[in-house]
Amino acid sequence: LKMCDENTICIVPIEGVTWTGLNDDVEALDKALDEFNKKTGYDIPIHVDAASGGFILPFLDPHKKWDFRLKWVLSISTSGHKFGLVYPGLGWVVWKDKKYLPDEMSFSVNYLGANITQVGLNFSRPAAQILGQYYQFIRLGFQGYKAVQYNSMQITQYLHDEIGKMAPFVNYSDHVENPLFIWYMKPDYAKTAKWTLYDLQDKLKQGGWMVPAY
């Protein structure tokens, strides 16, 4: 908040941080931002980047407040091609109310006999991903997604615990919040190791497992 001023467009917490696998505390941020806005007279909103957590939290932690139940959360984005269970590339952004979507972000055109309004940087594109998401919503429903995500979390927890037992490695956190976790090589082990995480990445790739290393 110390970096916010009259030119700040929004604050962007992340649910499912790529570098940690954890979630930012959006509820605490919303509370602090409310006090900040009252004090300064600003109306700085929150956009939640829920690329990973957006398809996890509603099903596995529905009581956690990170969404439109919070005062200053006005928009949320998530990836359909991650835990939304759709092939790449599909992303979603939703607003709390139409009034929060600036007119400057959308454009309308009369196309094939009808007025079409959209928000996007490109025009002609396939609808296959959207149809795939619609199919998954209809086929799985809330309970289906809940079952899939629960299973994903169980597998993640197992891998997290087992990798944590391996001598070369240490987990970034002692718990998992998404089907995503980070581990790294112990500094003392790395000093004498004849291989790196990039070597491990290459070996896993040979077995068909795409695991990023940084």
Question: Could you describe each region identified by the protein language model?
Answer:
Residues N23-T40, G53-S75:
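Active-site pre-lysine segment of PLP-dependent enzymes
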Residues D24-E27, A147, W195:
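Generic recognition of short, well-ordered alpha-helical segments
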Residues A32-E35, Y158, E162-M166, D199-W209:
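Generic non-transmembrane alpha-helical segments
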Residues D49:
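Glycine-centered flexible beta-alpha turn that most often forms the glycine-rich phosphate-binding loop
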Residues Y145-Q149, M153, L197-Y198, K203-G207:
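Transmembrane helix-loop boundary segments of multi-pass membrane transporters
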